């Protein structure tokens, strides 16, 4: 809990704070525009809205560029623990808002229930992949981005095909409550995997630096 509170306090000192806040606001605005204009039937609205959580991760992880942080006892927490904890909590809050919106829309436009649950299911899937991507992208950005895009594009195509043939019987039968539980579970699991990957890469970087400082 202390790390979580400290992480949120540190956001105000994040790298390029104004730029990140502007981008976060832009992504949120784009998400709202897509959601409102499509009445929640367009996946892009929820997608942009949920990805604003990545900025919390980015603002903390970039603090490691500071020489002060590199020599601080807080280095590991700022590079591994806090970004994951803070961004995961942000994702949980954003997802709660998104689920509440979908619930309200289902009550207002019950004829679109199928579409709302399809888009929510796909957003959960994409967000899970994005969280894992964050765990490795700051170490292997280009490689992880290429793999992420290929995997997401392939899986999205497969998922779209599956939903097209099965969404009426499978996804609709889940209901908004079960989809919400699935989403929360995916975010928490994504956070755990993200933490483990970040921790593994941190040890790898530390080992590499030690080896380079003691040449044979």
Which sequence ranges carry the predicted segments?
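Hydrophobic alpha-helical transmembrane segments of membrane proteins
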Residues: 1-66, 81-209
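Alpha-helix N-cap/start motif
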Residues: 76-77
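Single conserved hydrophobic/aromatic residue that forms the stacking wall/gate
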Residues: 210-216
């Amino acid at each position: 809990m202390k790390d979580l509170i400290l992480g949120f306090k540190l956001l105000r000192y994040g790298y390029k704070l104004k730029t990140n806040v502007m981008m976060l606001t832009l992504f949120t605005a784009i998400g709202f525009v897509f959601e409102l204009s499509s009445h929640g039937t367009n996946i892009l609205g929820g997608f942009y809205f949920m990805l604003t959580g990545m900025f919390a991760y980015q603002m903390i992880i970039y603090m490691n560029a500071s020489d002060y942080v590199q020599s601080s006892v807080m280095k590991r927490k700022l590079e591994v623990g806090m970004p994951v904890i803070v961004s995961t909590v942000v994702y949980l809050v954003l997802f709660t808002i998104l689920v509440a919106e979908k619930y309200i829309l289902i009550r207002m436009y019950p004829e679109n229930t199928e579409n709302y649950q399809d888009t929510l299911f796909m957003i959960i899937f994409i967000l899970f992949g994005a969280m894992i991507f964050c765990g490795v992208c700051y170490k292997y950005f280009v490689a992880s981005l290429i793999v992420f895009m290929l995997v997401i594009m392939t899986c999205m195509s497969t998922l779209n095909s599956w939903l097209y043939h099965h969404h009426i019987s499978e996804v609709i039968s889940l209901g908004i409550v079960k989809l919400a539980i699935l989403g929360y579970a995916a975010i928490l699991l994504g956070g755990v995997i993200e933490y483990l990957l970040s921790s593994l890469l941190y040890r790898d970087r530390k080992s590499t630096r030690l080896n380079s400082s003691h040449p044979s």
